Swiss-Prot record:
Disulphide-bridged cysteine pairs: C49-C52
InterPro entries: DSBA-like_thioredoxin_dom (IPR001853), DsbA/DsbL (IPR023205), Thiol_disulfide_DsbA (IPR050824), Thioredoxin-like_sf (IPR036249), Thioredoxin_CS (IPR017937), Thioredoxin_domain (IPR013766)
Protein name: Thiol:disulfide interchange protein DsbA
Gene: dsbA
Pfam families noted in UniProt: DSBA
Cellular component, GO, one term: periplasmic space
Matching CDD domains: DsbA_DsbA
Length: 207
């Protein structure tokens, strides 16, 4: 029993130490103008952004953040239109992915088609990535100009403007805090990712 208690106490102390090391201005920044009504955890990215590709494909930041979040916490991902020649089209395509619930199916193929093979040069090329990933062409076409997709595009644009987004990748919590990767421990990739995820969880709990 004593051993179990010591183990639990060690876990509590470890958590306390971890939480104590997270501070405003270092791992996160409190926004001057909080934005009400934003998703609990909101990530902005672009398929044109090399660092976003690293976050998704190499570091798996989003996956690690999701694992740490309390049950029921909503995590949302928005695409930005200010990067690349097809930024607007990719933002609309991401809205299609959200509407059809196929984000996980198309994320990696789109990143690779835009950055690795550079086979995405037109709106038709984007559509082909979806179809190759198993999305029916008719479903994609029906969603493309739908009211739902137009609304999701508007949501993405409004959130980026309201939060005064300066660049990507970026993550916000409760419309009040922005994660600051520059303040993270970069001694190793694992340490960086865990501190990033711990910071998001800390801010979700903080409310």
């Amino acid at each position: 029993m004593k051993k179990i208690w010591l183990a639990l106490a060690g876990m509590v102390l470890a958590f306390s130490a971890s939480a104590a090391q997270i501070s405003d201005g270092k791992q996160y920044i409190t926004l001057d103008k909080p934005v009400a009504g934003e998703p609990q955890v909101l990530e902005f990215f672009s398929f044109y952004c090399p660092h976003c590709y690293q976050f998704e494909e190499v570091l798996h930041v989003s996956d690690n953040v999701k694992k740490k979040l309390p049950k029921g916490t909503k995590m949302t991902k928005y695409h930005v239109e200010f990067l690349g020649p097809l930024g607007k089209e990719l933002t609309q395509a991401w809205a299609v992915a959200m509407a059809l619930g196929v984000e996980d199916k198309v994320t990696v193929p789109l990143f690779e088609a835009v950055q690795k093979t550079q086979t995405v040069q037109s709106a038709a090329d984007i559509r082909k990535v979806f179809v190759d990933a198993g999305v029916k062409g008719e479903d994609y076409d029906a969603a493309w100009n739908s009211f739902v997709v137009k609304s999701l595009v508007a949501q993405q644009e409004k959130a980026a403007a309201d939060l005064q987004l300066q660049g990507v990748p970026a993550m916000f919590v409760n419309g009040k805090y922005q994660i600051n990767p520059q303040g993270m421990d970069t001694s190793s990739m694992d340490v960086f990712v865990q501190q990033y995820a711990d910071t998001v969880k800390y801010l979700v709990d903080k409310k």
